[in-house]
Amino acid sequence: MTLKEFEKIIEETIENLPDEIKQKLDNVVFIVQDYPDDEELKRAKTSKHNLLGLYTGIPLSKRGTSYGMYPTTPDRIFIFKANIERTCKTEDELRKKIKEVVLHEIGHYLGMSEAEVRRALKNF
């Protein structure tokens, strides 16, 4: 899948979110890379080929009243293209996995724990 096609699926996933969630996506950027770099691997405590996505930043649930009073760098959601592609056999599987990873990382952005994200994805 081309990078452009991959990014289009990410955009569609975000566009199809319920409005109440979409409106909360503030000061966050989505970054597509083939693999995580050393800093991201250290943060996630995993191997290069196992990580499909990673959220870095201050989750919404932990932002205090002073958040945004001063310029802040955007939170980042990394989506690791080559790792996701490696886990899928068909294009349909790939599309579903991209959507799942994007939703998973948005869950962390919203402040959900790993267990909460996994439960929410079962119902989505």
Q: What feature does the model see in each segment?
A:
Residues 1-97, 109, 115-116:
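Active-site rim/adjacent substrate-binding subdomains
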Residues 114-124:
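Post-HExxH zinc-binding segment in Zn-dependent metallohydrolases
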Residues 101, 105-109:
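Catalytic glutamate of the conserved HExxH
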